[in-house]
Structures are given as structure tokens and as C-alpha cells.
Amino acid sequence: EGELEGANTGDVKYHLGFSSNLDTPGGEVHVSLNSNPSHLEIVDPVVIGSVRARQDRIGDEDRSKVIPVLLHGDASFSGQGVVMESLQMSQTRGFYVGGTIHIIVNNQIGFTTSNKYDARSTDYCTDVAKMIQAPVIHVNGDDPEMVVNAVKIATKYRAKFNKDIVI
């Protein structure tokens, strides 16, 4: 008694995933957030594989109808090998999805590295995206209008060039 039936439990809701159809001025859009345990970037190849499967299933040969968006923390983007593996495979025939939009948040919780000189060997966490020549847009997350502008630029870039881009 006193419990909500079907209520989600746990402290991090994105662990459970989410899926919904949203009405937009351009029509209905399906949005899916894959379940993601606290193993940070391990969801990246899962999302990319899911997108590729959906594209193949609906005959989306130009890779424009299903678009992967990955959210990253700054320390995990530059520090976890699964990111580099996903980037490396992104341009191959079997794994190509027409480009992924990567959004990196400097969440300042790369807590195992208190000294910036222990965090990485590059100036920016986004430098690993140079391996596929992905453009990088740096934006101040405290300026919501500029963040929206950066997302618009990234979306247009992905639509025109069918390649990864990083914000």
C-alpha cells in the first residue's frame, strides 16, 4: 500500500531508456533514448547499430530519416576507447549511418583526474574526433540561444555532408 504501480525506481532515469512519438510542425517524430547503464560510453555502438538497423528496415538508403545523436561527458569522450572504436568504424560500409551528431557536455565529473595534466594528452576532449576529420563547434552551455544555434548548424551539416559533427 502507498506504492505507485509501474513507477520507475533508481536514481538515474536514463538507465531505463525512453521512447515516444512527438507531434511537431513537420509531422510526427519518433524519439528513442536507449537504456544506458553507468558505464558511460558503452551505449555508443548500441545506438549506432540500432540506427543502422532502423535505416535498413525502412529502406533509408540516403540515411536521412533516422539520425543518431549521442550525448557524452568530456572526460569519457576522450578517455574511453569505445568512443575511438565507434568513430573509427563510422565511415565503413557496414556501420555507416550518414553521420552522428555528438553533443559533449563538460560535466566536470572526470572525478578520477583531479589534475588537468592527468586527464588527457590533447588540448580539447574533442581532439579525438580529428581521426575522422569531424568538425567541432565549441559553444558556451550557459548561453542557451547559442546552444540552439550550434545544434541547428550541426543538423544542417549532417544533412548536407552525411558525416559526424561534434558540439
How would you label these PLM feature ranges?
Residues 102, 136-138, 166:
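Conserved beta-strand scaffold positions in the cores of enzyme catalytic domains, especially
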